[in-house]
Structures are given as C-alpha cells and as structure tokens.
Amino acid sequence: VGLINGPRGKGRIEVIEPDVLRLSFRWDRPPAPLEPLILLLGLPRPQTARDLLREATTLGATALHFVTAERCDANYAASSLWSTGEWRRHCLQGAEQAFDTRIPEVSWSHSLESALASLPGGEIRVGLDNYEAPGALGACEEIRKRGEQPVVMALGPERGWGERDRTLLRREGFLLAHLGPRVLRAETAMVAAVSILRALRGQM
C-alpha cells in the first residue's frame, strides 16, 4: 500500500465484519525525492494526453505542463479529461507501474509563453524539434557536463512547434535538439527523450 506523494508500506486486514473493515499499516521510509524534470508539452488530443500522463509519471517527471502553442487546438483544454479530474487517474496508473507513490504537478491552462515566463531559472533547457535543431539529443554535451541540474524539456504538439514557438524557446535559452530522422508520436518521443536524458546522466 502507499499514500499518494507519501510513504509505501504493508497493510494487514485485522477485522472483517458485515459493516466494519479494519486495517493496520506499517510504513516504510518516504521515498527519496525525484530528480527535477519538468516537461512542457504542446497540448495534444485527449487520448494522447492520457498516454503522456501515464508514461511521464512512470518515468519520474516532477511536473507536466500542457501548453497551448501555435499549432495547438485550444479546445482540447476543455476536454472532460481535465474538467472531471480524470487526468489524475492516469497519473496514478503510471505511479503504480513504477511502484511509486509520487505523482507530478499537472497543469493544462497556460500558453507556452506564460509557462516559459514562470520557470524558476537555473535549469538545463532543451526543446525537441525535428526541423531546425542543429543536432541530436543524444549528442548534447551540455546535459552531460551539467550533471544533476534540473531539466526542463519542451516537446511540441502533434503538428510540431511553429516558428513563433521556436523563437520563444530560443529567447528563453532552450537548446533545440532532435531525436533522429523519423517523425514520432508525441508519447513515443517523450519516452525516447527522457530515456536519452537518463542515459546521458549515467542513470540507465
């Protein structure tokens, strides 16, 4: 058993009666803090967002900010995925898969520009882009050199970043990088990018 964003432990059923179920718990130490990894995700279709919520939580992202960008459909932010709180269930599934209790901070109501303006500062900033990136993410020495600094990774919407988005990312100090010549689904690109990031840091 586990408490959301708290310790794990073992539960034991002590009493079962027609109107009573009594449990006892023995808690382990709280898990170690996650390495800060903020994902800025161009707001996708709800089904893609569900996959991103689950997989990013499994991979240990600490914050997921779904942002409107030049090539996004802003109506996706009105989906019942967000308005009913369904998104939380997908995060919980991702945490369960990782045998963890922690779920990330999640937002879906900001523009790319406002999300960039709210970043704390001092992070390694990487934007994935298939068209204007000068090199591959796996060859990004900046990540390797800067060790354990927090990372902000920006992944475009399903139609990619627009020119205005790229200008904003560059202005805010993002290094543009690509994942190779093939065009990937958003959820596949996210898993590949986080895996490459972990490998660059010697974590896998």
Language model segments and positions:
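Short acidic/polar active-site loop segments enriched in Thr and Asp
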Residues: T62, Q149, L175
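RNA substrate-binding interface of SAM-dependent RNA methyltransferases
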Residues: P30-G127
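Structured adenosyl-cofactor binding patch, chiefly the S-adenosyl-L-methionine
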Residues: E163-M204
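Short, acidic/turn-prone active-site loops that include or flank metal/cofactor-
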Residues: E132, E158-R159, P181-L184
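Short, hinge-like loop/turn segments at secondary-structure boundaries
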Residues: L81-G85, R144, S195-I196
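A C-terminal functional module that forms or caps the active site or interfaces directly
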Residues: E148-L168
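N-terminal positively charged helical leader segments and presequences
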Residues: V1-R29
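A mid-sequence, solvent-exposed acidic-amphipathic segment
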Residues: S109-V151
